[in-house]
Amino acid sequence: MSDSVELFTDGACKGNPGPGGWGALLVCKGVEKELWGGEANTTNNRMELTGAIRGLEELKRPCEVTLVTDSQYVMKGITEWMVNWKKRGWKTAAKEPVKNADLWQLLDEQVSRHTVKWQWVRGHIGHPGNERADQLANRGVDEVRGIKRA
């Protein structure tokens, strides 16, 4: 039987584009692991995707994952849009290249390793896991901007 893991992810950006950060909180059998990072010039959507990718990458064997995000972009992309993007060779219905296709492809690769249940939550309303992921994403932004946290 594979491990059951909760993964809370978030992205943040100060300016869009601008300095951004991603955060991921993994919870398995009561043990928590915090992950975060950032990029100097990025977008909020890229950071949202990166949080999910990095969280899934951290899992070394196939798991049953409940991935919780406040990003409609990530949620709809993975559960609704991606199937058609792949059929069209990573093009939109308007025959334009899919934005952030590099990250969508990485996410698709990571998702294929696990059994993932996607759950959307409204951001910034006090959901504990989402709030923690948001704090981690903002830590990533601060580190990119050279702001140290205690």
From Swiss-Prot:
SUPFAM superfamilies reported in the protein's UniProt record: Ribonuclease H-like
Residues the entry annotates as binding Mg(2+) 1: 10, 48, 70
InterPro entries cross-referenced by the UniProt entry: RNase_H, RNaseH-like_sf, RNaseH_domain, RNaseH_sf, RNaseHI
Intracellular or extracellular location(s): Cytoplasm
Cellular component GO terms held in the UniProt record: cytoplasm
One GO term of the biological process aspect: DNA replication, removal of RNA primer
Swiss-Prot/TrEMBL keywords: Cytoplasm, Endonuclease, Hydrolase, Magnesium, Metal-binding, Nuclease
Metal-binding in keyword set: yes
Known EC number: 3.1.26.4
PROSITE patterns hit by this protein: RNASE_H_1
Pfam families cross-referenced by the UniProt entry: RNase_H
Role of this protein: Endonuclease that specifically degrades the RNA of RNA-DNA hybrids.
Assembly mode: Monomer.
NCBIfam families hit by this protein: PRK00203.1
Assigned protein family: Belongs to the RNase H family.
Name of the protein in its database record: Ribonuclease HI
Species, as recorded: Pseudomonas syringae pv. tomato (strain ATCC BAA-871 / DC3000)
Phylogenetic placement of the source organism: Bacteria, Pseudomonadati, Pseudomonadota, Gammaproteobacteria, Pseudomonadales
